[in-house]
Structures are given as structure tokens and as C-alpha cells.
């Protein structure tokens, strides 16, 4: 990664989107899956109705493991939460909510993100880029939408939180 330290390239850190499993809060060596040089873990919750065990595991990651929990693409999960109690409890936790930049292409996802923003929840933006063909980098469209809808200050707030979580200087 030495060649990537040139100012012409954006800083890149090794990280993983960690798929939730029952008991993850007690998993050994989980810290190895944190984003490089941070205590932040990007956690993908199950695409099913969450229960108290999922909630307890997330709490354990924060309180007992002292990790900064980032819930990956949170806007995708609302539709799976037919019983909203756990959803609401999850939204009250001191986690960071990561949303994908393409959230604005879907009315229900826009609504979820709007509620997060209006509730002043900590938010970061991700691209969910897997390749340059069918899952292309799309951060610009996400930032443009947020800027148009919520203002440049919101974009700066999201960007600064991302920098802070990754251990980069904030402006």
C-alpha cells in the first residue's frame, strides 16, 4: 500500500463488511475485522425480522467490546421489520448508520434516510461498489441528492463523521 500514499490517490483503509451471526458479541478475535487502525466495525444485520438477541449482540459489541458499531446500509432493513419495537430500539443505540448512496432511487429508502437525518442520527455514506459495471461507484450522486435536499452543511457533517471514524483529519 506504499504506492497509495501519494496525494494523487484517496486514502484507502482495509476493512470488511461483517455479516451478523448469533453470538457475534462474544466472538473471539472480532477486532481483527475492524476497519484498519480503528475500533470501527461495519456490521451487516440479517435481512429478517430482528429480535432481542440481535439487539443484545449489538449492545455487547459497543459496551463490552468497546467497538464503534457502524450498521451497514440501514435503509435496506426497514421492510423486514414487521414488528417495529426492535427497529426503534436499534435506532436509539449510539451506533453510526451507514446508508448507500443509491438510497435516493427508492421512495421507502428515502423515507428511512429522511427520518434518520431529521432525528439527527450519526450518518455516513457508502457506495456499495462491487465493480464498475453493475455496482459502480456512486458517491457523487448520493452526496448531490443530500446536498440538494438537506444542504451542504449536512454533506459536510456526513463527510466529517466518515473521516473521524476512519481516523483521518477533519477539516
Describe the residue ranges of each PLM region.
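A C-terminal functional module that forms or caps the active site or interfaces directly
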Residues: 85, 96-98, 104, 108-112
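Active-site environment of divalent metal-dependent phosphoester hydrolases
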Residues: 19-21, 76-80, 104-107, 130-134
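Short, hinge-like loop/turn segments at secondary-structure boundaries
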Residues: 30-32, 87-90, 113-117, 142-145
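Short acidic/histidine-rich active-site segments
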Residues: 121-137
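Short secondary-structure boundary segments
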Residues: 99-102, 127-129
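Mid-to-C-terminal alpha-helical segments outside catalytic/metal-binding sites
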Residues: 139, 143-171
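Conserved strand-to-helix beginnings and helix N-cap segments that scaffold or border functional pockets
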Residues: 55-56, 83-84, 109-110, 136-140
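Extended substrate/RNA-proximal surfaces in nucleic-acid metabolism proteins
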Residues: 1-98
Amino acid at each position: 500500500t506504499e504506492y497509495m500514499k501519494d496525494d494523487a490517490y484517496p486514502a484507502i483503509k482495509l476493512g470488511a463488511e461483517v455479516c451478523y451471526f448469533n453470538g457475534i458479541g462474544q466472538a473471539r478475535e472480532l477486532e481483527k475485522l475492524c476497519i484498519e487502525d480503528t475500533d470501527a466495525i461495519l456490521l451487516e444485520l440479517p435481512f429478517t425480522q430482528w429480535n432481542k438477541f440481535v439487539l443484545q449482540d449489538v449492545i455487547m459489541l459497543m459496551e463490552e467490546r468497546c467497538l464503534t458499531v457502524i450498521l451497514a446500509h440501514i435503509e435496506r432493513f426497514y421492510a423486514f421489520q414487521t414488528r417495529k419495537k426492535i427497529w426503534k430500539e436499534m435506532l436509539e443505540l449510539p451506533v453510526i448508520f451507514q446508508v448507500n448512496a443509491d438510497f435516493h432511487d427508492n421512495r421507502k429508502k428515502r423515507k428511512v434516510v429522511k427520518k434518520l437525518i431529521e432525528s439527527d442520527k450519526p450518518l455516513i455514506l457508502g457506495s456499495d461498489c462491487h465493480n464498475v459495471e453493475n455496482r459502480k461507484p456512486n458517491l457523487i450522486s448520493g452526496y448531490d441528492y443530500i446536498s440538494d435536499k438537506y444542504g451542504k452543511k449536512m454533506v459536510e457533517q456526513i463527510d466529517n463523521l466518515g473521516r473521524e471514524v476512519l481516523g483521518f483529519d477533519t477539516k
